[in-house]
Amino acid sequence: MKKKIRYTIMLISAIAVYFSCSYVPKLNGIDISHHNVVDWKKIRKNKDIEFCYIKATEGKSFRDPMCKKHVKRAKAIGLHVGLYHYFRTDVPAEKQFANFKSVYDKVPSNLIPVIDVEENGNDFSNISMANKRLKKLIELFEQEYGCKPIVYTGSWCCLKVITAFYDCPIWLRLLHVPHILPNTTIKQAAIINNLDMNYCKDINDIIL
């Protein structure tokens, strides 16, 4: 009998953990770059979608060629729009910020800017330098825009070795990271029709 009770408790616990990890109330945002082909008519018909983050820049010189067009289309269907910068470990923070600002100043947006921190294309072998540059970039964003930027990340490497962003709002890629950080503000929870789908509990938390 005791064995049966233990088994039942374990089963109930497993089910509870599964649903607590997998359930996301509402996917209400997308993030895109020049890699995405967006069907804006479908997005407009989806009344749950409230916001769209769009890639603006990367490193010291790359500027997404579709940024302005994506912003225009997103705003035309009434979405809140934000811009993000892809962080590069091999580029000084000042040069990265100058690149982002050059696009941000010319494109209308109303969401807190985002710094995208990922392993792809980066070398984290010099952890001290990566942290130093990211910390400085966060400071430059905060000085310019009056609030800490949201930091997107989703790899175990970034979460383990990069500490500079721990006091920033976090945008967590749940497809790769199964736990939630205390300051998680946005959750990237699914890919539908080649679009990253996200959940933000309160849109006011990310409005600039």
Feature roles, as predicted:
Residues 85, 153, 174:
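Short beta-strand/turn micro-motifs composed of small residues
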Residues 24-38, 42-44, 53-138, 142-145:
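Substrate-binding cleft of extracellular glycoside hydrolase catalytic domains
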